[in-house]
UniProtKB/Swiss-Prot annotation:
HAMAP family (UniProt xref): PyrE
One Gene Ontology cellular component: cytoplasm
Residues annotated to bind orotate: 34-35, 128, 156
GO molecular function ontology, one term from the record: orotate phosphoribosyltransferase activity
Functional summary from the UniProt entry: Catalyzes the transfer of a ribosyl phosphate group from 5-phosphoribose 1-diphosphate to orotate, leading to the formation of orotidine monophosphate (OMP).
Pathway(s) where this gene product acts: Pyrimidine metabolism; UMP biosynthesis via de novo pathway; UMP from orotate: step 1/2
Entry protein name: Orotate phosphoribosyltransferase
SUPFAM superfamilies according to UniProt: PRTase-like
First-tier enzyme category under EC: transferase
Cofactor: Mg(2+)
Length: 213
């Protein structure tokens, strides 16, 4: 596990974005942990979050031409990632996001920001069922662009309804890499280093054994 990944876990724990306990997911599964990126909700949070996204993106080595943040949660993520790439990695990249509803005045259309062209790096908080990715793909393809990759904060590494995770399905269906700041495996590795969190470690490992990919 990289140092920035450990810092991200501690950041998420400190903001209660990452919590341990018993949580019922939309899938009906009872999860021993919960991740709510919506609680990164201050200016400082967003500034730090962008640095973590930028770090993961640069480390991945994936070539891209524009960042795309799908409405709504992807919008601040794309924005802060673009700022962090420019400020900390000297990479001044264009970014773009979509509106849920088309605007019929001013610049019009459903896209805001840079043109959606070339190789698109899609940034979002998590992938649950892959629905948002499929919606974004229709926008990307309609603009004649191509999906270079997807970057999210956490890969839960768990099966969907079949044998694959939603992320593996996206990689299979669109032929791109999905990268994340951290994975469930990273989280388990972190818990193994924290003796005071041993009770959570057992529950998370049991969950991975049952639902993991």
């Amino acid at each position: 596990m990289k140092a920035y990944q450990r810092r991200f876990i501690e950041f998420a724990l400190g903001k209660q974005v990452l919590k341990f306990g018993e949580f019922t997911l939309k899938s009906g599964r009872t999860s021993p942990y919960f991740f709510n990126a919506g609680l990164f909700n201050t200016g400082r949070d967003l500034a730090l979050l962008g640095r973590f996204y930028a770090e993961a993106l640069v480390e991945s080595g994936i070539a891209f031409d524009v960042l795309f943040g799908p409405a709504y949660k992807g919008i601040p993520i794309a924005t802060t990632t673009a700022v962090a790439l420019a400020e900390h990695h000297d990479r001044d990249m264009p970014y773009c996001f979509n509106r849920k509803e088309a605007k019929d005045h001013g610049e019009g259309g459903t896209l805001v920001g840079s043109a959606l062209a070339g190789r698109v790096m899609l940034v979002d908080d998590v992938i649950t069922a892959g629905t948002a990715i499929r919606e974004s793909m229709s926008i990307i393809q309609a603009n004649g662009a191509a999906l270079a990759g997807v970057l999210i904060s956490l890969d839960r590494q768990e099966r969907g309804r079949g044998e694959l995770s939603a992320i593996q399905e996206v990689e299979r269906d669109y032929g791109c890499r999905v990268i994340s700041i951290i994975t469930l495996g990273d989280l388990i590795h972190y818990l193994e280093e924290q003796p005071e969190m041993a009770q959570h470690l057992a529950a998370v490992k049991a969950y991975r054994a049952r639902y993991g990919v």
